[in-house]
């Protein structure tokens, strides 16, 4: 599949992204970024006199090396120019900039000069939010940037970021022949920290709120599909909730943990402790666990929602299936060195027949073993598992782990009774949970462990024999 794959690289994640970034899959890398002021300048110093973080990262050895390698691998590296108006007073400066023809042109010329001096392959404009009464002025700015770039090199690329509501953005004008090459729809933050009901920050299809399907319906009625890229989140959302079920109302208060946006890696780490569930309509994984901010604080549940290989893959499929130019990622580095989202992207863009399941080994963490009884490791309420799994060299890559206390299999090869987890090296598995075949009674347990790859192949289960001496003694940790 020939598709644009745009990876946003925030200045604070340059070193993290360098660990796993796959330049073989990326077509465009957007360094995020340099701020535009309200009077047509590029902000080069903070009020304190310090150099802004974006400029520091721009000059860092890590980014210089990453940029050079990406361009050598054929990736277009562009510079994001940002202008945020979400905080009090900042939107007025956006109004001042867009309302001044002189300042717009000055900014366009400065952007083109910086791109030329630093050897970038284009520009990504991230102006948000966009008041509806400034839609025309923003189109004019984009045209002026296009003209300034063309004066340097007509091959320089130009894209614009658009918030998911689409409010204030004239998509047709922004992507006209004399304007941007692409509009990047930010397909996330449909739910934010203040959401009343927990759920995906990027729901594919959700009858309760605006979602990706509805957003693309609206956008495709305005511009051709090949002008659009759908950016997807490599981060999640967390709330305190009334129940462990979905949907659940969120809770707030002085003694209750508020909403948060954990990275993909942080969300996966939590699901490795408390299990992974999946909402097929929203195309999002989630996990829930009991939570209390302090010893005397109210008891709540905590829900964490995130896109794992299944959710991310479903949204990539949807975008490409509707003919979009491609997909984007916010943000590189949030995967924390994990590779399964990259594997998912590869499997979607370059699918190969994969009918071979992954394989692996499993053992009980020696530090959690209380002794030996009748040849079985003695454990208490939770089995701390060490897992080592891999897919075949030509396989689609690891996606999930499933663990249960019964070996009965469904037609697709997965354990009928069990709990699903991310494909992690360490998993905490409770032995008293009846939903997984457990019991509060002490006695022997047969722990069945299997893995699934991104193509959907389940491995035959491995079996660990343990003796549970106090199954009810278990803790479900969490801190997101």
Where in the sequence are the language-model features?
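Substrate-binding surface in catalytic domains of secreted glycosidases
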Residues: 39-58, 130-267
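Short, acidic/polar
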Residues: 9-23, 99-116, 165-174, 307-320
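Acidic/aromatic/glycine-rich contiguous surface patches that form carbohydrate-binding/processing clefts
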Residues: 311-353
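Active-site groove signature of glycoside hydrolases
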Residues: 108-137, 185-189
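Low-complexity, disordered linker/stalk regions enriched in Pro/Thr/Ser/Gly
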Residues: 352-480
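Conserved, mostly hydrophobic/aromatic
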Residues: 29, 125, 145, 183, ...
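Glycan-binding loop/region signatures in secreted carbohydrate-active enzymes
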Residues: 92, 234-315, 347-350
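Glycan-recognition patch characteristic of GH18 chitinases/ENGases
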Residues: 1-111
């Amino acid at each position: 599949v020939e598709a644009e794959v745009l990876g946003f690289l925030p200045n604070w994640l340059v070193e993290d992204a360098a660990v796993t970034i796959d330049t073989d899959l990326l077509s465009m890398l957007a360094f995020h970024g340099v701020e535009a002021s309200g009077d047509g300048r590029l902000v080069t110093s903070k009020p304190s006199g310090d150099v802004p973080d974006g400029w520091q990262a721009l000059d860092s050895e890590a980014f210089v090396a990453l940029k050079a390698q990406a361009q050598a691998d054929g990736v277009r590296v562009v510079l994001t120019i940002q202008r945020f108006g979400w905080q009090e007073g900042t939107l007025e400066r956006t109004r001042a900039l867009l309302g001044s023809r002189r300042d717009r042109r000055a900014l366009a010329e400065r952007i083109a000069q910086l791109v030329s001096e630093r050897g970038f392959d284009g520009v990504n404009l991230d102006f948000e939010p966009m008041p509806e009464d400034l839609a025309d002025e923003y189109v004019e700015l984009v045209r002026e940037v296009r003209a300034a770039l063309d004066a340097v090199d007509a091959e320089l690329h130009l894209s614009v970021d658009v918030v998911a509501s689409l409010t204030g953005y004239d998509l047709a004008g922004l992507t006209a022949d004399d304007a941007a090459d692409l509009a990047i729809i930010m397909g996330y933050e449909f739910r934010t920290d203040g959401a009343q009901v927990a759920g995906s920050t990027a729901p594919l299809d959700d009858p309760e709120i605006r979602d990706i399907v509805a957003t693309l319906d609206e956008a495709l009625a305005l511009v051709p599909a090949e002008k659009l890229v759908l950016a997807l989140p490599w981060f999640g959302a967390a709330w305190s909730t009334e129940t462990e079920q979905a949907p659940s109302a969120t809770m707030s208060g002085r003694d209750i943990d508020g909403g948060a946006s954990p990275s993909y890696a942080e969300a996966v780490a939590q699901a490795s402790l408390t299990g992974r569930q999946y909402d097929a309509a929203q195309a999002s994984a989630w996990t829930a666990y009991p939570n209390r901010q302090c010893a005397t604080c109210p008891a709540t549940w905590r829900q964490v929602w995130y896109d794992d290989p299944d959710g991310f893959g479903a949204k990539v499929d949807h975008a490409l299936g509707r003919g979009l130019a491609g997909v984007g990622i916010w943000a590189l580095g949030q995967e924390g060195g994990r590779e399964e989202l990259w594997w998912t992207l590869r499997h979607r863009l370059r699918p190969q027949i994969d009918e071979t399941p992954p394989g692996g080994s499993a053992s009980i963490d020696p530090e959690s073993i209380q002794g030996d009884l009748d040849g079985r490791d003695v454990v208490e309420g939770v089995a701390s598992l060490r897992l080592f799994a891999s897919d075949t060299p030509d396989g689609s890559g690891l996606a999930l782990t499933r663990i249960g206390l019964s070996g009965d299999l469904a037609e697709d090869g997965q354990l009928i009774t069990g709990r699903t987890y991310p494909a992690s090296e360490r998993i905490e598995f409770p032995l008293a949970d009846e939903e997984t075949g457990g019991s509060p009674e002490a006695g022997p347990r047969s722990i069945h462990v299997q893995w699934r790859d991104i193509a959907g192949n389940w491995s035959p289960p491995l079996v660990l024999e343990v003796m549970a001496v106090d199954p009810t003694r278990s803790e479900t940790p969490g801190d997101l």
